[in-house]
């Protein structure tokens, strides 16, 4: 039974990405599977996203693959993880958006924290910027 599951889903490695089209395509390096499959590279694997969020995973990221009907030629990428970049120490209920450079927007019980990792912040195409706050502190 477990062998059959290995043919339906698996954790593989991202070895390339093309974000130029309507659907992001990944190059995936698959390790050998338990049913006699050899390790191989798959090109142009579609990656699915939740609406409103997008990213390009760093090379070497883990990717959860779903193989439709157990066919490795009919694979889609449904989730990615890059362990070295993942923020640690969040509490239950916290959320964060982050990138490989250390830029992070963290939402916690104490409030919203934005870290630009020493890089500039640019706001484009705004008709107005309103700060509805009692105090601004610059350090």
Where are each of the predicted segments found?
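Exposed beta-strand/loop interface patches that mediate assembly or binding
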Residues: 1-109
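Parallel beta-helix/beta-solenoid repeats that form elongated, surface-exposed shafts/blades used
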Residues: 85-139
